[in-house]
């Protein structure tokens, strides 16, 4: 997170929300009729969902790069995917938020699969590798800058930012469920209070016997007890939901660390296997070179012996002719 004014940060999220509301009120634009199709396939799962074109996919990546920092700062990013869908509609591409999110996940999965592939093969198999790599590199630069400027909060921010990549697996916050529970408790208590008030007001004899002081004191005491009960129940639900959310987040973090360790182990094994293969190749080349040298030495020895014998025979013939 960059060190900008918190009021500007709040205003940025407010603009995104306002933009989404405006887009929901407008009629949807016509479908794009681009002819060039994305070789990676569409982000949807049904037959009626049109395939993603290359232009459409590039536009999605451009919008996702523009909002990447906001995605990393927001745990509940369902609203942000609505903003992405609205921006896609502005460009003439009609896609739902779920389709955009699914397409992004598929692209990230293919990007990770290309990390051990040769560069030439990457360009042929996955044409959007450079765009996604640019997004992740910009994210890493922001994290490094943030760690350099605010070291005291870097570790906490690191956990929060990396949790969004696994890419976009959301863990629901407890606030919404807690608020719904609190509203339910308030409505229930309100109905019970209305029933008690109605039953008391419909009996004039009982109302006449009670004094105003006693009635007001009882009402204040009942209201105080009700508010206390609601607050206590709210606190219990808050603690419970926060614990459940924390446990779920810790489980996902443990799973992520396991996957990362497994990936590193496999990469180390592949590197060792590659080094062993290279050593075996070098040993075979050395053996072949030694065999070639031995054969060359034998050939030279045979040639020398043959030449010496021919010279001796020639000298003997010449000597015999002299006699």
From Swiss-Prot:
Annotated Acidic residues bias: 164-176
Disordered as annotated region, ranges: 1-51, 147-176, 190-220, 269-297
Predominant place of localization: nucleus
GO BP field: regulation of DNA-templated transcription
Biased composition (Basic residues): 1-20
Keyword Protein transport: no
Any one of the GO CC terms: nucleus
Tissue expression pattern: Predominantly expressed in roots and flower buds.
Boundaries of every Myb-like domain copy: 52-108
Intracellular or extracellular location(s): Nucleus
One GO MF term: transcription cis-regulatory region binding
Protein keywords: DNA-binding, Nucleus, Transcription, Transcription regulation
Quaternary structure annotation from Swiss-Prot or TrEMBL: Homodimer. Heterodimer with GT-3B.
Primary role: Probable transcription factor that binds specifically to the core DNA sequence 5'-GTTAC-3'.
Name of the protein in question: Trihelix transcription factor GT-3a
Lineage, opening ranks: Eukaryota, Viridiplantae, Streptophyta, Embryophyta, Tracheophyta
Gene label: GT-3A
């Amino acid at each position: 997170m960059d060190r900008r004014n918190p009021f500007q940060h709040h205003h940025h999220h407010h603009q995104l929300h306002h933009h989404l509301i405006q887009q929901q009120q407008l009629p949807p634009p016509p479908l794009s009729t681009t002819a060039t199709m994305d070789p990676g396939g569409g982000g949807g799962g049904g037959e009626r969902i049109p395939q993603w074109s290359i232009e459409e996919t590039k536009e999605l990546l451009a919008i996702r790069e523009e909002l990447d920092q906001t995605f990393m700062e927001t745990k509940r990013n369902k609203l942000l995917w609505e903003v992405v869908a609205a921006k896609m509609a502005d460009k003439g591409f009609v896609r739902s938020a779920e389709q955009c999110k699914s397409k992004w996940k598929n692209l990230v999965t293919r990007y990770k699969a290309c990390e051990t592939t040769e560069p030439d093969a990457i360009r042929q198999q996955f044409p959007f590798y450079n765009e996604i790599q640019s997004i992740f590199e910009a994210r890493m630069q922001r994290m490094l800058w943030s760690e350099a400027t605010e070291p005291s909060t870097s570790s906490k921010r690191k956990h929060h930012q990396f949790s969004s990549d696994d890419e976009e697996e959301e863990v629901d916050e407890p606030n919404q469920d807690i608020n719904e529970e609190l509203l339910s408790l308030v409505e229930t208590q309100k109905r019970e209070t209305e029933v008690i008030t109605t039953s008391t007001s419909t009996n004039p004899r009982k109302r006449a016997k009670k004094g105003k002081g006693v009635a007001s004191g009882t009402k204040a005491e009942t209201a105080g007890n009700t508010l206390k009960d609601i607050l206590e129940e709210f606190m219990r639900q808050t603690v419970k939901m926060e614990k459940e959310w924390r446990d779920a987040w810790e489980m996902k973090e443990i799973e992520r660390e396991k996957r990362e360790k497994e990936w590193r182990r496999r990469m180390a094994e592949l590197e060792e296997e590659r080094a062993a293969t290279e050593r075996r190749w070098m040993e075979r080349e050395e053996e072949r070179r030694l065999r070639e040298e031995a054969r060359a030495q034998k050939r030279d020895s045979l040639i020398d012996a043959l030449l010496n014998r021919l010279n001796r025979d020639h000298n003997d013939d010449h000597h015999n002719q002299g006699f």
